[in-house]
Amino acid sequence: LSRRQRQMCIRDSYYTNPQYPEFLRSKYQAIEDNEQRWESYQAEDADVVLVAYGISSRISKEAVNMARAEGFKLGLIRPITLWPYPVKAFETCKNAKAFMTVEINILGQMVDDVKLAVENKYPVGFYGTFFGLPEPEEIVAQAKAMLEKEGK
């Protein structure tokens, strides 16, 4: 490329429309307002709400059924969109005393998302596995232990 062509590329690679930042801000706000997707399963009256997606969510749903059969109020939020994160889903959990992410990793990648969604008003725990899949019995036991630890 000639010097002039390089200068044109550099100059033209920046978007200089002054309305563009506001357009982007309003576009992202509309997406955040309208595109949150989730599935809620018995979370409205739950004492502890599990947050899981993928295989973990199917195992967590089994844990919810098992806990409910024992009289322990466990619920589940399954995020369908990870961006925008479904913060509106957490508004329906009026009785929740704690939240716990169930993940097939040892890092707790969703813990911070859940803490932000509940605005740090509730304890947020993590149950993860590295080798193999989580067991419903282990999830229920961990949720009960978390509730006892919080003294609620």
Segments (PLM) and residue ranges:
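Solvent-exposed alpha-helices and their adjacent loops that cap or buttress functional pockets
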Residues: 40-44, 91-94, 116
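Glycine-/acidic-rich phosphate or pyrophosphate-binding loops and their flanking alpha/beta elements
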Residues: 25-48, 61
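Peripheral docking tails and interdomain loops at the edges
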Residues: 103-152
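C-terminal substrate/ligand-recognition segments
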Residues: 51-60, 67
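Generic long, charged, amphipathic alpha-helical segments
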Residues: 61-93
